[in-house]
């Protein structure tokens, strides 16, 4: 897995001039990674449902996921030689490694702690939803994330969208409503938890993009920081909610099943960590638009596998609602991709005079922090090829100061 992920930035884009054999190998590598991604995601969701059906402690499952993230990312960051701090400008060609702190101190109370709390709350809410409702329905509700992103971006960041973007939300709304009214195993708390998790993920998306843009820290490094800080929110909740129940419960069924439960929890944590890393590898190898297609296909696979393996009852109308919502997510991604490409073309100079006339439009740079420059709100956001709807899938345009510059979690 790591070998595939460390193919290098050149492999990610499909190097021009590569022979037919190289293209075939690249296609085979993407196909294998996509199959692994689908299998880990679908298998992880099925395992989570199996665990929570017999072991109804969603906080424990969330804690295992956070701990797997904290344990797995540091060796991965060292293996991929991701710098601990953003690259800085200096004499000589190219960026230079930085040895300062990961983020400026002001970022921690303003962004890191709220984002870590959001990660904790979103993880717990997501597992509560899987506990209360079928996996297929929970993933259908998660398809509402573009709606939350558009609304919150308009309210918080004052970002306006095109008419096409707003119209692309209609199939998502219609599909989720149709799936909700026809869901045979509907539970109000399951719906509320799934919506709360999606809302938290959307807020994470907005503010994580801001941190990534303003600090230029590697997003895997930021994910590691958020995971480690989320543990401080997760452990007190686990002690108060789950551990206290373990200590006072008179039901010894949990004790007799501990070996099997612990094995499933370990498998769940590994699947969650591995699918994030493989998703990172896939976006290094394909275009963002192809990735959005692969991501929509993954959601279809998760829903299909969960319906087959868990055998929860569904109707044809219910399935139609699920597929409509997922199609809406793909249409939204395609519309956003086209809008970002158009904005990017508008920023590219046509001639030398255009370049000179636009030079004064560049945003000023904040005061250096330990030698690292942190750009403000100017044109840096348009250097991204595509910003999709989840922090896991946001791509940044960092300099090639380390092996993996085109990235995704």
From Swiss-Prot:
Coiled coil: none annotated. The modification Phosphoserine is found at residue 363. Signal peptide: none annotated. The chain crosses the membrane at residues 50-70, 111-131, 133-153, 165-184, 188-207, 222-242, 252-274, 282-303, 312-332. It is found in: Membrane. The keyword Transferase does not apply. Keywords: Membrane, Phosphoprotein, Transmembrane, Transmembrane helix, Transport. GO terms for cellular component: Golgi apparatus; membrane. Pfam families: TPT. It is a multi-pass membrane protein. InterPro entries: Sugar_P_trans_dom (IPR004853), TPT_transporter (IPR050186). Putative transporter. Belongs to the TPT transporter family. SLC35E subfamily. This is Solute carrier family 35 member E1.
């Amino acid at each position: 897995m790591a070998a595939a992920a460390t193919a290098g930035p050149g492999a990610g884009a499909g190097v021009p001039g590569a022979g037919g054999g190289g293209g075939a190998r690249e296609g085979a590598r993407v196909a294998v990674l996509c199959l692994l991604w689908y299998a880990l995601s679908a298998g992880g969701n099925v395992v989570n449902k199996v665990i929570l059906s017999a072991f109804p402690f969603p906080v424990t499952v969330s804690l295992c996921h956070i701990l797997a993230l904290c344990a797995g990312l540091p060796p991965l960051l060292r293996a991929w030689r991701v710098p601990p701090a953003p690259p800085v400008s200096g004499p000589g060609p190219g960026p230079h490694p930085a040895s300062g702190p990961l983020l400026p101190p002001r970022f921690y109370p303003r962004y890191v702690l709220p984002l870590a709390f959001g990660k904790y709350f979103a993880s717990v809410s997501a597992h509560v939803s899987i506990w209360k409702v079928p996996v297929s329905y929970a993933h259908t509700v998660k398809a509402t994330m573009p709606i939350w992103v558009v609304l919150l971006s308009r309210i918080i960041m004052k970002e306006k969208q095109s008419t096409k973007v707003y119209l692309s939300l209609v199939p998502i709304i219609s599909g989720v409503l149709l799936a909700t009214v026809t869901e045979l195993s509907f539970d109000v708390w399951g719906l509320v938890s799934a919506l709360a998790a999606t809302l938290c993920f959307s807020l994470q998306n907005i503010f994580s993009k801001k941190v990534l843009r303003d600090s230029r820290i590697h997003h895997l490094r930021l994910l590691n920081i958020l995971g480690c800080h989320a543990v401080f929110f997760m452990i007190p909740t686990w002690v108060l909610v789950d551990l206290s129940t373990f200590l006072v419960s008179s039901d010894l069924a949990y004790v007799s099943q501990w070996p099997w439960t612990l094995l499933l929890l370990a498998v769940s944590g590994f699947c969650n960590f591995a699918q994030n890393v493989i998703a990172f590898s896939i976006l290094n190898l394909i275009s963002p638009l192809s990735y959005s297609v692969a991501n929509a296909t993954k959601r279809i696979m998760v829903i299909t596998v969960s319906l087959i393996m868990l055998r929860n009852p569904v109707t044809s109308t219910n399935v139609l609602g699920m597929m409509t919502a997922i199609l809406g997510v793909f249409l939204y991604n395609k519309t956003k991709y086209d809008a970002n490409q158009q904005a990017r073309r508008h920023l590219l100079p046509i001639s030398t005079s255009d370049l000179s006339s636009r030079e004064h439009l560049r945003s000023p740079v904040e005061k250096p922090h330990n030698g690292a420059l942190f750009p403000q709100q100017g044109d840096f956001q348009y250097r991204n090829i595509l910003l999709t709807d989840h922090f896991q899938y946001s791509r940044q345009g960092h300099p090639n100061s380390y092996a993996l510059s085109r990235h995704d979690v």
